[in-house]
């Protein structure tokens, strides 16, 4: 048992001999230095380096020639942090051995990659901002030209009426008159005047003379019957049941004759329709100021507008 313990205790130096044979006892282990270098930059530190955004939503303000642009503390602080982190994290005892420099080579390459990426983004944002400043500076450097920018559409001095050519309205609204009766022949004056339809309830209710006759002589019932019995959508028999020019004239008149036996008020429709035509003609003759001649010549009569004279008493 003692021999095995001695042989077992003597086996440990034999196992450690090939592993520690090429290094002195006072030198540090390069693998320990590598594990220390791996933890130089953590994820929070990398995020802290790239947490600022130098891009702006609007155009940058052009600095005046008399004033110097203020330094950007965020950019300087960023570069200080980029260059300061690897320096503070380096242990001082690793600067005197080649083993430590070979172990630090891949780590420094990763740090330089991060710093070069941040520098490239900073360079891109700086170049974009400088190009915007050059564009804005060239536009604002003109001086009086920039002050004379037109912001409101200029108005023409001429009135719209002066640009229009002479038309019929320039000669006068009622310049064209009939040669026989001497009345105006414009469309407004020669249009026939219908009977008023809003003459009750202070012009709030529509009650035309035609509707009064239709409901008073029960023709509205005939129109409703023809409307429901008609198969053609384009058939206007319901609108003019007594018309002789439309289709199915004999059928309509026969149906109205049969219905007049039950509705004797239908016999009053034709006399009431004649009275309506007579009243319409009388009302139109009184209220229409234009010409009612069928065949007549048109004469243009323009009376020049002369300003009134001021008759002063002689002194």
From Swiss-Prot:
Key word Nuclease present: no
Span list, region Disordered: 1-140
Bias (Low complexity) ranges: 108-140
Keywords on record: Cell membrane, Cell projection, Cytoplasm, Cytoskeleton, Developmental protein, Membrane, Microtubule
Comp. bias intervals (Basic and acidic residues): 20-32
Site feature Cleavage, where: 144-145
InterPro entries reported for this sequence: Sprouty (IPR007875), Sprouty_domain (IPR051192)
Sequence ranges assigned to domain SPR in this UniProt record: 177-291
Top-level division of the source organism's lineage: Eukaryota
Region: Required for interaction with TESK1, residue numbers: 178-315
Subcellular location: Cytoplasm, Cytoskeleton; Cell projection, Ruffle membrane
GO CC term (a single one): microtubule
Chief location: cytoplasm
GO process annotations (BP): animal organ development; negative regulation of epithelial to mesenchymal transition; negative regulation of ERK1 and ERK2 cascade; negative regulation of fibroblast growth factor receptor signaling pathway; negative regulation of lens fiber cell differentiation; negative regulation of protein ubiquitination; negative regulation of Ras protein signal transduction; negative regulation of transforming growth factor beta receptor signaling pathway
Modification after translation, per record: Cleaved at Pro-144 by the prolyl endopeptidase FAP (seprase) activity (in vitro).
Coiled-coil segments on the chain, per record: none
Polar residues: bias regions: 1-15
Similarity remark: Belongs to the sprouty family.
Subunit field text: Forms heterodimers with SPRY1. Forms a tripartite complex containing GAB1, METTL13 and SPRY2. Within the complex interacts with METTL13. Interacts with RAF1. Interacts (via C-terminus) with TESK1 (via C-terminus); the interaction disrupts SPRY2 interaction with GRB2, potentially via disruption of SPRY2 serine dephosphorylation. Interacts with PPP2R1A/PP2A-A and PPP2CA/PP2A-C; the interaction with PPP2CA/PP2A-C is inhibited by interaction with TESK1, possibly by vesicular sequestration of SPRY2.
Protein name as annotated: Protein sprouty homolog 2
